[in-house]
Structure formats: structure tokens, C-alpha cells
From Swiss-Prot:
GO terms for molecular function: actin binding; protein phosphatase binding. This is Proline-serine-threonine phosphatase-interacting protein 1. Dephosphorylated on Tyr-344 by PTPN18, this event negatively regulates the association of PSTPIP1 with SH2 domain-containing proteins as tyrosine kinase. Phosphorylation of Tyr-344 is probably required for subsequent phosphorylation at other tyrosine residues. Phosphorylation is induced by activation of the EGFR and PDGFR in a ABL1 dependent manner. The phosphorylation regulates the interaction with WAS and with MEFV. The modification Phosphoserine is found at S318. The gene is Pstpip1. Its main location: cytoplasm.
């Protein structure tokens, strides 16, 4: 395994006035800050997408309908709607978790910014001090060099004048050489003083540079670790959401396994059956066969008219015979026993169709039902209803909270 390299050993520059290593490190930290923002933006957009998706799933589940279905498929569809809503809620919760992770990253990024700013301020100070003293030192060195050259020139001139010059020229040259030497000595003193100050500034800068490199490396280590963990957690959150979705949909699959197609068909037939026999064929009737030969001494009256009159009398409460009619006619209009039984039997069937409960019984609604017209009643699963009339066609008259209407009898169970 490769040994861990250190920033403090790899980001120096031989140019005294250059700070390339520090600038490279600082740019790396700024690039890392941008990377943090990129990850935050990814989490922000994913959270928005999860929230939109979750809310749309909830709306889809609540508007799915399915009230026209019944029995086991209705149960499975209701389970699908419920689990779809649960999946939507889970995705909304995932969006909240992503926003919490986003908030943590933002706080981490701001903490790193504050720490980096402190070191930037220190480095700016020591770098400016070093550069300023370096410039001052170089100027003093330049002055020192010039003073030394002037002193050398003055010394050489003094030596030439001393060999063959006048006393006055010798003294003048000697004084100039002395002054130049003193100026050179002073320039050397200033130069040495600046060198010492520059060395102290350089030492301070070097120490701060090492400290800053170590701090920047620690920041980079923390940033990489935090972002790696954040991406790992993000992937785990998405994977867990997939598992959660599958668990919720598994509940739907379990209800679908119990869906009985034949049972649903049988249940529909039992609750909605309209009869077991088809209508009888319509017989041919000869127009002239409807006329009946009248009896001797009685008026010519068709039997069908007598049947209609008797049927009307039963419906409206009129007497069986008309007082103004002759006795002979009354006897003639009396139908045969077979026809009489047919007429009365048909009326009795109509009068007794549907079992009217003398005392209303309580039933519980097994399913929701939405009224399709004004004479039906809306019910919800669990409602307690009083059954007034059990219709043979499968539609029962019920009462709830003072309201009456028709509901499917198969939707109720007796308490």
C-alpha cells in the first residue's frame, strides 16, 4: 500500500516571491466547495422529484375509482389503491430525508468555508509581509552594492592621488574615500538588518504555510469522507425505498392470489340474477279466432272484455258484477275456473313481490356503494342500516339516518 503523501511536503516553490503551491491548494479547496454544491443540488432536485412523485401517486390512488367492481377483485383493487397511496407517502418521507441530508451538507460546507477563511487571512498577511520585506531588502542590497562600488572607486582614486598628487587633492580624495566607506558601512548595516527581518518573516511564512497545508489536507480529507458517506447513504436510501415499494406491492400480490374469478362470477350471478327462465315464445293468434259465439238469449259479448273488466275491478276495488247488467249476462261473463285462477294468480304475484319486513332488521354494509340515481342511497363500509324491503331482484330498500333508498343486497350482512 502506498504511503500517505502530505500537502506540507509537496507544495513548495523555489521562487522566493512565488506562492504557486499555496494557490494550487487553495484552488483545490474551492473546487471541493463547488463539488459540495453539486452534490447538494443533486439531492435537492431528487428530493423535489420524490415529493412530486409521491404526491402524484397519492392523488392517483385517491381518484382511481373502482366502485363498480365487487367481490374479490374489488378487494384486490382496493388493496392496490391503498398500497399505491402508501408508496406515495413513503416517497414523500424519502424527500424529507433527502432534504435533511442536504441540510447537513450545507452546514458542513459553511463550516469548512469559515475555517478556510481564517487560514487565508493568515497566509495573506505573512505573504504580504514577506514580499514587502523582500522588496525592501533587495532595495537595500542594491544600495549596499552601489555604496560598496563607490567606496572602492573612491579608495582607488585616493591611491592614485596619493602617489603623484598635491596635498590638497590627497586630503580631498581621502575624505571622499572615507565618506564612501562610511556610507557603504551604513548601507551594509541596513542591508543586514533587512536580511534579518526578512528571515524572520520567511520563517513565519514557512511555518504558517506548513500549518495551512496540514489544515487544508485535513479539510480535504473531511470533505472527501463526508461526500463519500453522503453518496453512500443516498444510494442506501434509494435501495431501501425500492425494498419498501416491493413490500407494499407484495401486499397487493397476496390479495390477488386470493382473487377467485369463478367466485366473482358466481357472486355477481347471485346478487344480480334477474331470473332463470327465458320469456315464452309469442304465439300466433288468428284475428277471427278471438270472436266467441254468443249463447242463446245473451248479448254478444267477447270473453276478453269480461276478463278486462274483472281485472279492473280488482285493481280499483269495483264490484265483480254490474247491477244494471242482466242476470243472464252476468252468468255468461263469469269466466271458467281455469281462467279465473290465472287472473287472480297473476295479481297475487304482483302484490306479494318482495318480502316486506314487518319489523325492520339491522344490517351492516360490507362495501362502499355510490348511488347511481336519485332513488338509490350512498353507503360506506361499516354503516348500520335498517332493511325495510328485501327485493327479489337483489335491490333492497334500506333506511339510514331517516333516509331511504335502494342498495344492492349483496353488499349487506345481517347483524
Amino acid at each position: 500500500m502506498m504511503a500517505q503523501l502530505q500537502f506540507r511536503d509537496a507544495f513548495w516553490c523555489r521562487d522566493f516571491t512565488a506562492h504557486t503551491g499555496y494557490e494550487v491548494l487553495l484552488q483545490r479547496l474551492l473546487d471541493g466547495r463547488k463539488m459540495c454544491k453539486d452534490v447538494e443540488e443533486l439531492l435537492r432536485q431528487r428530493a423535489q422529484a420524490e415529493e412530486r412523485y409521491g404526491k402524484e401517486l397519492v392523488q392517483i390512488a385517491r381518484k382511481a375509482g373502482g366502485q363498480t367492481e365487487m367481490n374479490s377483485l374489488r378487494t384486490s383493487f382496493d388493496s392496490l389503491k391503498q398500497q399505491t397511496e402508501n408508496v406515495g407517502s413513503a416517497h414523500i418521507q424519502l424527500a424529507l430525508a433527502l432534504r435533511e441530508e442536504l441540510r447537513s451538507l450545507e452546514e458542513f460546507r459553511e463550516r469548512q468555508k469559515e475555517q478556510r477563511k481564517k487560514y487565508e487571512a493568515i497566509m495573506d498577511r505573512v505573504q504580504k509581509s514577506k514580499l514587502s520585506l523582500y522588496k525592501k531588502t533587495m532595495e537595500s542590497k542594491k544600495a549596499y552594492d552601489q555604496k560598496c562600488r563607490d567606496a572602492d572607486d573612491a579608495e582607488q582614486a585616493f591611491e592614485r592621488v596619493s602617489a603623484n598628487g598635491h596635498q590638497k587633492q590627497v586630503e580631498k580624495s581621502q575624505n571622499k574615500a572615507k565618506q564612501c566607506k562610511e556610507s557603504a558601512t551604513e548601507a551594509e548595516r541596513v542591508y543586514r538588518q533587512n536580511i534579518e527581518q526578512l528571515e524572520r518573516a520567511r520563517t513565519e511564512w514557512e511555518q504558517e504555510h506548513r500549518t495551512t497545508c496540514e489544515a487544508f489536507q485535513l479539510q480535504e480529507f473531511d470533505r472527501l469522507t463526508i461526500l463519500r458517506n453522503a453518496l453512500w447513504v443516498h444510494c442506501n436510501q434509494l435501495s431501501m425505498q425500492c425494498v419498501k415499494d416491493d413490500e407494499l406491492y407484495e401486499e397487493v400480490r397476496l390479495t390477488l392470489e386470493g382473487c377467485d374469478v369463478e367466485g366473482d362470477i358466481n357472486g355477481f350471478i347471485q346478487s344480480k340474477s334477474t331470473g332463470r327462465e327465458p320469456p315464452a315464445p309469442v304465439p300466433y293468434q288468428n284475428y277471427y279466432d278471438r270472436e266467441v259465439t254468443p249463447l242463446i238469449g245473451s248479448p254478444s259479448i267477447q270473453p276478453s272484455c269480461g276478463v278486462i273488466k274483472r281485472f279492473s275491478g280488482l285493481l280499483h276495488g269495483s264490484p265483480k258484477t254490474t247491477p244494471s247488467a242482466p242476470a243472464a249476462s252476468t252468468e255468461t261473463l263469469t269466466p271458467t275456473p281455469e281462467r279465473n285462477e290465472l287472473v287472480y294468480a297473476s295479481i297475487e304475484v304482483q302484490a306479494t313481490q318482495g318480502n316486506l319486513n314487518s319489523s325492520a332488521q339491522d344490517y351492516r354494509a360490507l362495501y362502499d356503494y355510490t348511488a347511481q340515481n336519485s332513488d338509490e342511497l350512498d353507503i360506506s363500509a361499516g354503516d348500520i342500516l335498517a332493511v325495510i324491503l328485501e327485493g327479489e331482484d337483489g335491490w333492497w330498500t334500506v333506511e339510514r339516518n331517516g333516509q331511504r333508498g335502494f342498495v344492492p343486497g349483496s353488499y349487506l350482512e345481517k347483524l
